[in-house]
Amino acid sequence: MILFRSAIADWNQVPTGSMKPTILEGDRVVVNKLAYELKVPFTSWRLQRWADPTRGEIVTFYSPKDEKLLIKRVIGTPGDVIAMRNNQLFINNEPASYGQLDIDIIHQLDLFQQTRHTFFVEQLGETKYPVMLRPSAPDDYNNFGPIEIPAERYLMLGDNRDSSLDSRVIGLVSRDRITGRAHTIAFSVDYDSYYMPRMDRFIRPLEYK
């Protein structure tokens, strides 16, 4: 089992809300460690590489700042030029589009969070996913770039844009720090309700449709 979790697939507990509303605190997320490559178990030595992360995928990686295992969404890939203007993303000079998010996703959050944030479906090309934003004046956190992403580097952001320690804080993430692609919530417990199971979040794909 330990060998399986090291080299093939793992499940990770999510302790923070940086990926809300896609991933909530208490979710257990399944990570495919064979999505991009095969590594020697318990090491970072790569035996074979067959794919690279693409924009919009949710990945796990070790932070270049403190080596903590994080989960974020890939926004910038090698060769991309990324900018943000008052929380709106621009990819290669093309603005992301923002549409209405399904109300059922918003209602997963408590009323305090619902009233403090605005919610959208952010779309980059054919890729779309939920994001939540807190209306605020422009600052260095919601305005940056343009940044050209160098080879073997990736720009990561949390879906909870104003409450995420992502590439705006830790910098770009090198390819060798990425450990796998997250694709499913295996199960979930509610920390605020005595760890009661959230049955509606069991075996739930992370892909937004």
Annotate each PLM feature.
Residues 16:
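A short acidic/basic microdomain associated with nuclease active sites
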Residues 10-13, 21-209:
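Soluble "head" domains of membrane/secretory-pathway proteins
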Residues 1-7:
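Hydrophobic membrane-insertion alpha-helices, especially the h-region
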